[in-house]
Each structure stands twice: as C-alpha cells, then as structure tokens.
C-alpha cells in the first residue's frame, strides 16, 4: 500500500483515497495482530502516515488517527525483546521480500529494526502534532536508544555493511540489501559507511537482489 500511495501522490494526489486506505488497513482496537499479520506491514503503515503528512501537511487527519497509532505501537512495544528489538513471534509473518534465494527470518533482523526505529521517529512527530508531548518524549527516548544500538549490533567491518540478522546476540555472516538500503535512505549511518555500503552492497551484483 505504501508504494501505491507514493504513486498516487505523484499521479493523482488523491489524498482522500489514501486516508481511507490508511484507516481501513489499521482496523479496530483492540490490536490482536500485526497488520495482515505481517510485522513489516505494521511498520510500513506507520511510515505511510509519515509520508502522508509530509505530502499533504494534513494535521487534522494525523490528530484523528493518533489514538490508533498509539495503540498499535503499544502492541509492538509489548512484543519487544530484552534488547528493545523486535523478532517474529508466534502468529507473526516476517515477510521482508519474495527473494529468489534463502532469506533467514529468525532472530533480530536488521531490516526490521531499521523500520521499527523509523516508526518510533514517526510516532514522535505525530505525538507532537497531536499535542501529546509526554508521549513524544517517550517515543523519542525509545527511538534514540534503538538507533544507537543498530551499528554495534549489526555493522560488520569485514563485510563493510550491516549484516542481515543476529541470533542469540551473534551476528550472521549474511548480508542483504534491505537494512543497508533503508539505513542509507534514513541517514542512520555516517557518510563514510554509506559510501562503503554503496560499494559492498548496493552496487554489488553478488548480493541477493530485491524482487
């Protein structure tokens, strides 16, 4: 849906359709699962609200939606591990991509943590727009804490990239495009490391392609 919204903004700017879809995808409270049971989709939903506001400046919609955003984030936070990170749990579908090769979905996936961090940053923005400053401070603390953990947890000097996942605190040797691409998009790494990723991952044809 988030990709469709971006095409909509570019071709039609039909914000009403985007709003209705965001509402429908969110569903009703209480939250009992991730959106479509897919953890990635929950984070994309938060990011779609961020995009919507950036394209439209529609504070009223964000204020109306904020209680549903908060309850969904409470669901996510209630399922974090001892590191404050997310992992697939019973009933979750960790999708990532329809990759042609093997894609490990176990443990702490760097890709999911990057999306989770950006979702928390989205909550900071939306809480402020909704006038919920205490919430905003709480989300800011959580996002800052998670962001500081990303490099120590997933950066590999050997690979010159973020590794795909960690299991039991141990880095895998697998490197995929997903986390590295989003970390560059969101400026989560230094310029030096972004350039390393460009060569070691983004321009490297041996890395599993995105489908």
Which residue stretches match the model-derived regions?
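Active-site core of glycosidic bond-cleaving carbohydrate-active enzymes
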Residues: 1-211
């Amino acid at each position: 849906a988030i990709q469709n919204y971006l095409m909509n903004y570019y071709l039609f700017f039909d914000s009403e359709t985007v709003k209705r879809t965001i509402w429908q995808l969110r569903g009703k409270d209480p939250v009992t699962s991730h959106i479509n049971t897919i953890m990635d989709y929950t984070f994309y939903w938060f990011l779609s609200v961020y995009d919507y506001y950036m394209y439209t400046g529609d504070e009223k919609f964000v204020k109306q939606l904020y209680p549903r955003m908060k309850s969904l984030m409470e669901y996510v936070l209630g399922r974090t591990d001892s590191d404050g990170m997310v992992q697939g749990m019973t009933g979750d579908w960790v999708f990532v991509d329809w990759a042609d090769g093997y894609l490990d979905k176990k443990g702490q996936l760097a890709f999911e943590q990057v999306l989770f961090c950006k979702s928390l940053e989205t909550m900071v923005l939306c809480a402020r727009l909704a006038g919920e400053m205490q919430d905003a401070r709480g989300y800011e603390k959580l996002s800052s804490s998670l962001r500081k953990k990303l490099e120590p947890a997933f950066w590999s000097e050997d690979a010159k990239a973020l590794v795909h996942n960690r299991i039991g605190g141990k880095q895998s040797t697998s490197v995929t495009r997903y986390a590295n691409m989003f970390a560059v998009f969101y400026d989560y790494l230094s310029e030096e490391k972004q350039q390393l990723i460009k060569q070691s991952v983004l321009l490297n044809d041996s890395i599993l392609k995105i489908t």
